[in-house]
Amino acid sequence: AAVDEGRSHLAGAEDLGGDYLLPGLVELHTDNLEKHMTPRPGVDWPSASAVLAHDAQIVAAGITTVFDALSIGDVNPKGKRMQQLPKMLEAIGEAAASGDARADHRLHLRCEVSHPQTLEVFRELVEHPLVQLVSVMDHAPGQRQFARLEKYREYYQGKYHLSDAEMDAFIVEQVANSERYSDAARAAIVDVCQGRGLSVASHDDATLAHVRESAGYGMAIAEFPTTVEAARASHEHGLQVLMGAPNVVRGGSHSGNVAAAQLAGIGVLDILSSDYYPASLLHAALLLAGEHSEYDAIRYDLPRAVAMVSRTPALAAGLTDRGEIRVGLRADLLQARALGNNQPVVRQVWRGGQRVF
């Protein structure tokens, strides 16, 4: 095996016609499957069909390794996440075992530490062989992502269609649950993960105290820090700072928190995640590296930008066999071209040397 420049005379060689040949993308945090499980409010879709549709969308975006982010603990009083959880786990496992999945699917357990049942459910699900990443979250109002109470009210009241009275009661309940459960659940979950050698991510750290706590627990990744202060401190403590690719494509955070481009500009952005929109992953990398874009002043070179969606996330999750075009690593590859506005077009995708798209 070899990785060379120049002409090839091998019988099976392909001319990519000037397109990019890139390592297959590695996605650490996507809840895209949930949209396929519930394509409309009140509509439950068969889980096997949902997983295959999600998988097709993932591969078409150039993602060859995906950590499906499944939430434990539903803050929505009318939500079905906890009921859907075992169905999603089973369907992902079956698709992976049967070879029907085109991407390499791993599991990312997102643990809402303020929920009363989270720790109990986590202890059961962490035994699943596909679990390789865990994050700890606390979405209670008045801190982290929702330091501004009006943003919390606007987001959840609109999302869950709550009346003013229901929203007031919801806020009181979430604050009380956070005070009662979060600290103990976070400590217990991290302890289990350390015993199993699983990478752990913090979520929405906003202050130096949050970051010191995360670093003290030995966390590897800082997901979506909400302030420049927290992102800088996370970087200094050796946590890989992860931000949303949609944040780059859209030009800012939908929650009004720090912009990913701002963190890129000061050199503390390490990993991008497609979060809720798979096609944003490669698009964001090309924007950060591209000419004639709003990110011209940042100008990551292409290898650095691509590493944020391939090699760096792979290593952060403990995967050392992928994320780079190098002899001895998996032949997870994609062919893509960039249109004039840095919009990528994925042409072909290979996983383990086999074409899957």
Model-derived segments and their meaning:
Residues 1-2, 18, 62, 349-353:
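Glycine-centered positions in the ABC transporter ATPase nucleotide-binding domain
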Residues 1-22:
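Histidine-rich, glycine-flanked metal-binding segment
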Residues 73-77, 81-205, 275:
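Metal-coordinating catalytic core of metallo-dependent amide/deamination hydrolases
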Residues 109-119, 204-209, 213, 221-223, ...:
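Active-site glycine- and acidic-residue-rich loops that bind
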Residues 128-132, 194, 213-221, 236-242, ...:
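Glycine-enriched alpha-helix->loop->beta-strand junction motifs that scaffold or abut catalytic
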Residues 180-182, 202-204, 222-231, 250-257, ...:
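A general structural motif
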